[in-house]
A protein has these predicted regions:
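Sec-dependent signal peptide recognition
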Residues: 1-9
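Hydrophobic h-region of N-terminal signal peptides that target proteins for export
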Residues: 9-17
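Jelly-roll (double-stranded beta-helix
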Residues: 17-204
Length: 204
């Protein structure tokens, strides 16, 4: 009986200790940029099954096309999921699942992984010039890791101050362009001339 109990405990330990790969890189996904704070990915859910993976970072993002996928839990439960263009999200690390693309035209999104385990918490406290984003931006999400803004192109204060590090994602004809703006930057615009939609992720 002791031997059986030991075997059961060993199997439980192995199950708990099981490791999974990170979600990216994988087919359909391109790394757009990386620095000490973030990794930015352009993600497409191709019509195929992807291996089980674990999100090792807190992450956030925005979908820029509609699309379908099937999310499969560690226990094997299958959840058909439809995502809509311009929906945003903020999610914690530790999520473990697999995914299958289910659309003829794949779901696409820009994902930011936050490399620091906790918010950095540092802001630029200067009061001049006017701080980003001014009065014309719409706040979409606010969490302990990030604030997501949708900007009206061309309507930011000029010049303006970025009190936090930020990732600017501009879309022109569903083609994303990603720019990192460091904390303390003072400039006149986000270099998004001609963009159809502009979103900024202020990293905390």
């Amino acid at each position: 009986m002791l031997t059986l109990r030991t075997l059961v405990l060993a199997l439980l330990f192995l199950a708990q200790a099981q490791t999974y790969p990170p979600p990216y890189p994988r087919p359909g996904t391109t790394k757009v940029m990386e620095n000490d704070l973030v990794i930015v990915w352009d993600v497409s859910w191709l019509k195929q099954a992807y291996p089980t993976h674990r999100h090792v970072y807190d992450y956030a993002g925005i979908y820029y096309t509609d699309g379908d996928r099937i999310i499969v839990s560690e226990q094997g439960a299958r959840s058909p999921t439809h995502s809509v263009a311009w929906d945003t999200f903020v999610l914690p690390k530790g999520i473990t699942h697999s995914e299958e693309g289910a659309s003829e035209q794949p779901l696409r999104g820009i994902f930011l992984e936050f490399k620091q385990p906790k918010p950095v918490g540092t802001i630029d406290t200067r009061t001049s010039p006017a701080a980003f984003p001014g009065a014309s931006a719409k706040q979409l999400k606010d969490s302990e890791r990030v604030t997501i803004w949708e900007l009206a192109p061309g309507q930011l204060p000029s010049p303006h101050l970025h009190t936090r590090d930020a990732v600017v994602v501009a879309f022109t004809g569903l083609k994303p362009r990603v720019t990192f703006v460091g904390r303390g930057t003072v400039h006149g615009d986000e270099q998004t001339t001609g963009a159809d939609r502009v979103f900024t992720f202020e990293v905390k």
